[in-house]
Amino acid sequence: MADILSQSETLASQDLSGDFKKPALPVSPAARSKAPASSSSNPEEVQKEGPTALQDSNSGEPDIPPPQPDCGDFRSLQEEQSRPPTAVSSPGGPARAPPYQEPPWGGPATAPYSLETLKGGTILGTRSLKGTSYCLFGRLSGCDVCLEHPSVSRYHAVLQHRASGPDGECDSNGPGFYLYDLGSTHGTFLNKTRIPPRTYCRVHVGHVVRFGGSTRLFILQGPEEDREAESELTVTQLKELRKQQQILLEKKMLGEDSDEEEEMDTSERKINAGSQDDEMGCTWGMGEDAVEDDAEENPIVLEFQQEREAFYIKDPKKALQGFFDREGEELEYEFDEQGHSTWLCRVRLPVDDSTGKQLVAEAIHSGKKKEAMIQCSLEACRILDTLGLLRQEAVSRKRKAKNWEDEDFYDSDDDTFLDRTGLIEKKRLNRMKKAGKIDEKPETFESLVAKLNDAERELSEISERLKASSQVLSESPSQDSLDAFMSEMKSGSTLDGVSRKKLHLRTFELRKEQQRLKGLIKIVKPAEIPELKKTETQTTGAENKAKKLTLPLFGAMKGGSKFKLKTGTVGKLPPKRPELPPTLMRMKDEPEVEEEEEEEEEEEKEKEEHEKKKLEDGSLSRPQPEIEPEAAVQEMRPPTDLTHFKETQTHENMSQLSEEEQNKDYQDCSKTTSLCAGPSASKNEYEKSRGELKKKKTPGPGKLPPTLSSKYPEDDPDYCVWVPPEGQSGDGRTHLNDKYGY
């Protein structure tokens, strides 16, 4: 004890004197690896800062803690340490050693290991690790690999190499590199997984290391023997194996698994294996007392055992709906909101477990409600597929469908008294629609209007009831309260709170229905056609028609064959234009004449209508004698002498006309035609008016009056014939076709 006290006193004096010493300069990594252990550092302080090596039971890392100093001999501790920490001077204070002490199993790497630095998809550089025991990563300049990212700690992590034993052998943990996090703030990531602090994690060739939030990736390169072997198990099998390991570990931690049970299990396995080996012989494919597999009852499960999820993974809702249809049940999803955009979906399956309870498939999903429904359907399909019920034939498992009609389309669990949402009635209506009890007819404008009227009527009735009940409640009763209550109950004027709430809810539903119906009515409303208003011309035309009906149909005037309608009735039509000689057809056209012709035609139509009215008024004023039909037909026929005389006279006059005197001669021609009057007075009046009109409408030298073809009615002004220009026949050919031969 005296020796120990004396040593502690000497160490304390050394610490006091060491505070006034000059701090040591930073040493380069190469020189530091070769430099011997400095004796000026205090081993107790180093021992306090150095972490204890912890072992992860699941990752298979080394379970060798750093050596604990013996209070009796500090010199032996310094000799055992192969790599003591080197003090690194900080810019703002005295020298500070890294908080890491190399374990005794560490040693320099003899294999050609290297560390590649990758950033942005390109390799920035390669650092050789051959001959180094460990590599220190951090933000300080004294670290082996200096990182400038602000999320990297000053001393962040260490890549420690484990050397093999002296005889070339090693422990259960093989030689290689191990990653050790020095309790950094933002952590160290190995293959995108954050490793626990102060724990050695094995790093194989090809593994990727990242420090904090830095984007630089460090890839370990080395011999192929150190590369991690790929597992033959799938991801799901690895997850199941991991779960089993965790369960066994929990049992061991809780002490549930005793050594006796393990011994019993191992003994039973040995006995079973020995009996099987002893009884092994020719069994002809049939074992004695063989237990039939449950899967033999369902061959479809064996057929699709390797591809189970391929049957329903694309559309789980459809597969689950098909199962419920075969079972004769209704598929209903239940939703519970667990939090913000987090849904718990639940489906009750028509299958019982071994204890007789109904199986329920549940799924929690963060996102949309529809996605939670799909996840729940997928989980239900997996449960049913595990039981071998999802892909069975409909004949083998189909149950008898419920006869909803016997129960008035209500379920046995439905209770309308406790229902406040109206969901049960909606389900009942849907069942009735599926059964065909409710005929859905297409809505029309009339049906929508009728529904809107009914909704408005019901809405007004409910509002009146609510108003009356509120008035009764507001009025203070003069009589006894009990008598007033009994009278109100008999009259039914007052409403209790539940009925008032129901009426308010019904009012809200009716208003929504009213808005919906109004929107539909706007869509299907027929087009509004404005009413026809009678104009003055239509009224006068109707009066004239009524007057004409009272007149006789023939014998109105002589020479009526010219004015015979297509229907055979006698009437008045516009006058026929005379046929002009072909000499006038060869005259040149002038553009101004066309506008004058249109104006003159309009004036002619107005005058003709005026003459029609005058003639009708004259015929109504004087009575016309009745004429026999034969005489009327003879009078309606035009005299042939008169027409022949007109044609000859016009041809003679037109042949003698010159270009300068055409206007004057044409007026004389119209006078001669007007002098040749017929025997009747009406014919003379008509010819006079026609001559006056032709005087005003005398064509100029370049004007071409239109000619009528015999194919169309000559006495109908609605028809006109197009006349081809000079030198053309109307078939599209001109003199250029003949000239150039095309």
Curated annotation (Swiss-Prot):
Region Disordered: start-end pairs: 1-112, 254-282, 565-742
Keyword Ubl conjugation among UniProt keywords: yes
Compositional bias per record (Low complexity), positions renumbered to this chain: 27-43, 699-708
Placement of covalent cross-link Glycyl lysine isopeptide (Lys-Gly) (interchain with G-Cter in SUMO2): K441
Residues annotated as domain FHA: 135-195
GO molecular function: mRNA binding
Gene Ontology CC annotation, any one: intracellular membrane-bounded organelle
Comp. bias intervals (Polar residues): 1-16
Domain of life: Eukaryota
Modified residues (Phosphoserine): S28, S90, S258, S412, S476, S655, S658
Biased composition (Basic and acidic residues): 72-82, 607-619, 732-742
Acidic residues composition-biased segments: 256-265, 591-606
Coiled-coil segments on the chain, per record: 443-476
Identification of the protein by name: Kanadaptin
Organism: Homo sapiens
Organism lineage string: Eukaryota, Metazoa, Chordata, Craniata, Vertebrata
Gene this protein is translated from: SLC4A1AP
